[in-house]
Amino acid sequence: MEGFMDSGTQTDAVVVLSLAQAAVLGLVSENELFGATISAEAFYPDLGPELSGAAMGEPEPPGPDVYQLACNGRALEEPAEEEVLEVEAACEKHTRRKTRPPVRLVPKVKFEKVEEEEQEVYEVSVPGDDKDAGPAEAPAEAASGGCDALVQSSAVKMIDLSAFSRKPRTLRHLPRTPRPELNVAPYDPHFPAPARDGFPEPSMALPGPEALPTECGFEPPHLAPLSDPEAPSMESPEPVKPEQGFVWQEASEFEADTAGSTVERHKKAQLDRLDINVQIDDSYLVEAGDRQKRWQCRMCEKSYTSKYNLVTHILGHNGIKPHSCPHCSKLFKQPSHLQTHLLTHQGTRPHKCQVCHKAFTQTSHLKRHMLLHSEVKPYSCHFCGRGFAYPSELKAHEVKHESGRCHVCVECGLDFSTLTQLKRHLASHQGPTLYQCLECDKSFHYRSQLQNHMLKHQNVRPFVCTECGMEFSQIHHLKQHSLTHKGVKEFKCEVCGREFTLQANMKRHMLIHTSVRPYQCHICFKTFVQKQTLKTHMIVHSPVKPFKCKVCGKSFNRMYNLLGHMHLHAGSKPFKCPYCSSKFNLKGNLSRHMKVKHGVMDIGLDSQDPMMELTGTDPSELDGQQEMEDFEENAYSYASVDSSAEASVLTEQAMKEMAYYNVL
């Protein structure tokens, strides 16, 4: 202890403090000059200046006033006797050292600008700071603040500043533009980046085992790395002034903010990876008429109403489509295109064609579809010049040309699978008199029709009815005739209830109930519903009577009159009135009788309803129509296999006339 009091050999115990730390302790002001020396007087204010450099008498253990701090007057607990002895031993150790120069105070500078060679650390023995301290000093040691991080070696003794430490809080960096000279790296807690230029990566310690992610925190080079097991741990970060860009924030608020900032950094990283800087200025604006301007692309001259659409369009030229479908992973340039595409997965088709009611997901598809209903065909074949509404149709058509399977009409451009179909189609462009019969000068559109017609002149009838022995030149004529033997009349008029064997006869009959009579005779000005009825009527004005009876030689101008006459030779009157005993050889005569005598009209041979009245129908028109139908349906129902030769000749003649009137 005597050596400790010797002023000749004893130097003052000094500690390295920065200006900020000295200002916090109340030792110096912030305007203090560099190189100031802090002596033991600052820590022991009760010792006068006369005792600082002279030998002291008996050494006495320091009392409570010795540990009184000048900044706020808070006193520490009195150290134990063992601690006093350790302090004395430490002071004796300093007596054997050489005189050291005054220690410079380190000014408060930014961590990234502090050099290693500018820092000097000295070992200082301070009362109450021993590793064997009692339990009373343990909490204060554990709560040591930012001053602990300024010492590199575990052997360096630190001053207990727990009385001046604040409550542990979390640092949050203020959003601002980073400085260009700072190389800020994104935070990754699992994969820390390697050290650069011998300096550890910037980091800040949380009050727990995990590190706080920060973008602008830098660790000065004189601090020990966090992985050093001997380095003192920082349980509470040192308060930093607001001018450094930090604000205080509680841990719960920080977690909520970092969750959103992480998403923003992820989006920003995606945009950064594009590595494309699109600069759009007013030079992209072009006049669009009506004092409107549009943003026009300089690569394809396509224009848009908004600058954003132009930017996404330019990115599309570079193959960048940032919007992906979650269902099929298809990429799109704009979010509106993605929303339209999602309608296909939802089954929604809002755009409908007004002509055929076909629905589409996009208006562009509907517009392209409308070309099918118009004469506009923008896609033309370079082989034959035929136009198409869709490019897919054009491609499929050109494939037929290349494979030789396409037979195209030179008049209208239609294609056919076979050459026969093409030749038949060409006949429609060459007029109605291409194929003409040499026997009767009748013309036909197709060759097959002329060939069937020539069978009538050659008297070739290969199709024979098994019921009555009637022969027909075509199979469909036999099928129609066979229905008359079955008595099946499946087609019924909805107006008058009359039944028909053939649907064509029923449709022709339905025209009688309409008020439209477009066909008129130029001789008597009588009007008719059907063209065929007018042709039949014209025979009345002709002096020629082509229908002649083979039995008596009587001639008739209409076929049904000849058929009725033949019933007289046979002695048969098959049509009987249901109201009286009158019989008739023709159904038309029976109908006329029922209309005049009884005021009703019969329904048919098998179903005669006397309650059905004929209203709004011309009797002559009805009789003529019924006579035509009677000829087609019932003319041959009374011929038998063992008929005479005359009847057979008559039947053949009737068949010829039927074919004559059926062909327009």
Curated annotation (Swiss-Prot):
Region of interest called Disordered, as start-end residue ranges on this chain: 121-141
Keyword terms, alphabetized: DNA-binding, Isopeptide bond, Metal-binding, Nucleus, Repeat, Transcription, Transcription regulation, Ubl conjugation, Zinc, Zinc-finger
C2H2-type zinc-finger residues: 295-317, 323-345, 351-373, 379-401, 407-429, 435-457, 463-485, 491-513, 519-541, 547-569, 575-598
Crosslinked residue numbers (Glycyl lysine isopeptide (Lys-Gly) (interchain with G-Cter in SUMO2)): 110, 113, 377
Gene3D superfamilies given in the database record: Classic Zinc Finger (3.30.160.60)
GO molecular function, one term: RNA polymerase II cis-regulatory region sequence-specific DNA binding
GO cellular component, one term: nucleus
Organism: Homo sapiens
InterPro entries cross-referenced by the UniProt entry: Znf_C2H2_sf, Znf_C2H2_type, ZnFinger_BTB_dom_contain
SUPFAM superfamilies: beta-beta-alpha zinc fingers
UniProt subcellular location: Nucleus
Gene assigned in the entry: ZNF710
Protein name: Zinc finger protein 710
A single GO BP: regulation of transcription by RNA polymerase II
Cited function: May be involved in transcriptional regulation.
Highest taxon of the lineage: Eukaryota
